[in-house]
Amino acid sequence: MVSPGQNDLSSDKSQIDPFVKKQNAKLTQVIQNFFSKSVQIVLQSRIQSESHNKEEQLKVGGDVGGHNVSSKINKWFNLHMYNDNLPKEELKLWKNINDVSQMPPMIIEVYLDLRQLTAIQTVILRDDNGNPWTVAKGGSKKHEVVLERWLIEFDANTVSGTIVDELPLIYKQAIILFRSLYGYTRLMPTFKLKKNLNKSNLNIGCKILDGKQPISSKGRIGLSKSIIPHQMLTTESHMSHKHFLPIQTTLGTLKISIAYRNHHEFSIHDNEELLSTHFVNIDDNDKDSEITPVEIEFKEELKIDRDSTTNEKVNEPEDDESHHADVESSQEHLQSEEPDESFEQDAKHISGSRKKFSISNNASMSLSPCSSGPQTVTEDSPSHNKPSANTTPIVSQRPTINPFKVGSISTSPPATTNFGGSSLERKVSITSNKSASNASLAAMLRNPRSSTSSTNTTANIPIANNNSNNQYNSTFPRSVSSSHGSNLAHDNDNLLGFSNPDNTSNTPRFSSSFGSRASRRFSNTSGRQSSLPSGNMNDTSLLATSAGSASSDAPMSGLYIDDDIGDFVRMIDSKSDLRFSGYNSNNDSKISYNQGSNSQIDALNKFQMLKNQHQQLSDSVSASLILHHNQLSGSRPSSRKSSHSIHSPPPSLPSGSYDNSHLPSINSKLRENSSTSGNDDNLARDSGTPSSRKNSFDYSTNSNTTFLKSPITNKLVSSPVTSTTPIHSCLHKTNNESGVISGLATTPSIYNDRRQIHYESVFDDDDDDYANNTADNRDQDDSLKLYLTNKLANAPKSNTNSRSLKSSTNPPNIGEDDDDDDDDLLFTMSDMNLAKH
């Protein structure tokens, strides 16, 4: 008999089983549609046209009108999408399985179809810098390039806790996941490639594969194969991975992940275009930047010599990069993907071409070397670790680009010892700076180690030794040899264009860009270094060590660059300084720095004061011209009396209105016989008036005429000084236009760009004062000109300093308010004209 307790347990079990079965059946249906919905979203964003995508837009609820009634709408997960292009045959494997624990992982591969290429076309891929890299040639064995690999799997080993009513939660999580997937597929590089390939012969295709079956890589370029060399990538890898948030259920976990290429700029080019680009790159960089069909055939011959240990292997399965390794079914699929090695054997010519292409393109990106010969990277270089001489390695790290490389690998001198290699090196940047002065050059050469420590980007130039040939010397740049004044061997002497006349000194010759003046520059301290004997010609370094190196049989016999630098510094220090007039000193005597600087300052001040003599000459010449013009004009007397007196201001602009640098510095001989004190000069500069006012006409000095002491004559002498002021020329320029003088007497270059100002002859104002003395007027004019001539010739001492200072402080009184405004305006205009000059 069955106990009542047993009946209760059996009845509870029978009641639970139908509910669990129903829940599992619904969950299985959700999992099946999860796979089909993922395929539908990926295919729609990759292979369908834009017009079709517009008709099949994302819709949340509702109906789509105007579409074919026969096509069904997939409304799962609130994404209304048509099932027109859904591959039903490929999806049967996941639709017909009732036991979800046996459901295999699904792989969706998105590839670039190359079957439509012609024989004269080549597909290239551009990297982040725009450099083209060859993918495949039309008619080759490679027909596909894998762009993306999607992995949709159900992991039965990872389950969640028992939830009685979990279907609504799972369904809501799936809705969020598919909406994210829908948007992400349109942000990936392959979607951009799809838009760019609308008018080309390239197409994008998709494949749905069983994750448990091995994937053949024959005739394809796998996702794990980088078309762009790793050292040319800006990222760590050529592809990226994305894992979406998994959805956990009581039966297992739903996962979606993707691995895709980062670069999508595929394009088609004709072989003739690539060939022309190839020759252009040879002319520019002496390197190939494009792959040619000839190189492909050459690489096919080289693949026979490849060692099996150097072949690129897929150590890690392609699918292992996109899903977890703990899935048993996924591990079986990943292990089955090792036949990619056959693809490697079939694609050796392309991979080998890409390797060579990467090195050549890397060389083309560096700056042009200084040597005349092209730099080549030989594949049989001892730096390569490959056992085969015809292969080039894949560089694990990006090489450092040295833009100042001199010479090539094949023409470089053989290495000697570490001591020689470290001691016989010299930075080019010491004398390559043309804009640096000799003082800064000497400062750098006095401390060569500290000055050259900052030049990290320049390359070291080794000095040629006994084993160096003429080829290396000829490839040395001409500019370096001329700037360092080096004595090159035989042909380099002809290359420099001059020879050394003698060898009387062991001081090295540093050639100058001034040409023939270099010999005059160093003639006092050093002689020319003659050409060395032919027996010791190869012992001379490229940087031209001292002539004493000719006596040495080896280039490293104790003579270093520092010795030559010290000789050069001593040669510069022994050069005599520039001596000013009055700064008398013997070249052999040692004068302190303070005494020398003070003497130089005094000499410069004395030279600057010579400008004032030029102003005195200008004033005297202007006065003489006006007197001469007055004598010839014979104009009528003016009705207005002149208000100017002997205390009128000098014909100059006010203090501070112009800079002394605008005044011409003409070496005048007016003060050769005069002894003007320095205090008078400083007083004249402080008062704001030129020092030429100190040398105003002295009426108390010796003269051979007696009428100069009369008031009338004094008025005549002072009138020319006031007649050239801007105020007087502006107020009276319309009264008499017969006399024209361009510019002021003190600064004749101020009004060159302005209109010529007509000055009034102010001597007409003074005709009323001595009209009764008409018989003596002509004699007085002649005597006045004689007086001015004597003044210019003798230049006596000036005794009218107080008179000049007084006249500079008392401006002329015009007597009208409007004249004061015009005075300010004219001085302002004068400042503007000075600023322009």
Swiss-Prot record:
Q: Which UniProt keywords apply?
A: Autophagy, Cytoplasm, Protein transport, Transport
The function of this protein is: Activates the ATG1 kinase in a nutritional condition dependent manner through the TOR pathway, leading to autophagy. Also involved in cytoplasm to vacuole transport (Cvt) and more specifically in Cvt vesicle formation. Seems to play a role in the switching machinery regulating the conversion between the Cvt pathway and autophagy. Finally, ATG13 is also required for glycogen storage during stationary phase.
Comp. bias regions, Polar residues: 358-400, 476-486, 524-538, 658-680, 688-704, 796-812
Which residue windows does the record flag with biased composition (Low complexity)?
450-475, 509-523
Q: What does the sequence similarity comment in the record state about its family?
A: Belongs to the ATG13 family. Fungi subfamily.
Encoding gene (name): ATG13
One Gene Ontology cellular component annotation held by this UniProt entry: phagophore assembly site
Compartments in which it is found: Cytoplasm; Preautophagosomal structure
- What are the start and end residues of every segment in region (Disordered)? 302-400, 446-540, 631-704, 793-837
**Which residues lie in Acidic residues bias regions?**
815-825
Protein name stated in the entry: Autophagy-related protein 13
The annotated subunit structure for this chain is:
Interacts with ATG1 to form the ATG1-ATG13 kinase complex.
Choose any GO biological process term that the UniProt entry carries and state it. mitophagy
**What Gene3D superfamilies does this protein's entry cite?**
6.10.140.1900, HORMA domain
Comp. bias intervals (Basic and acidic residues):
302-336
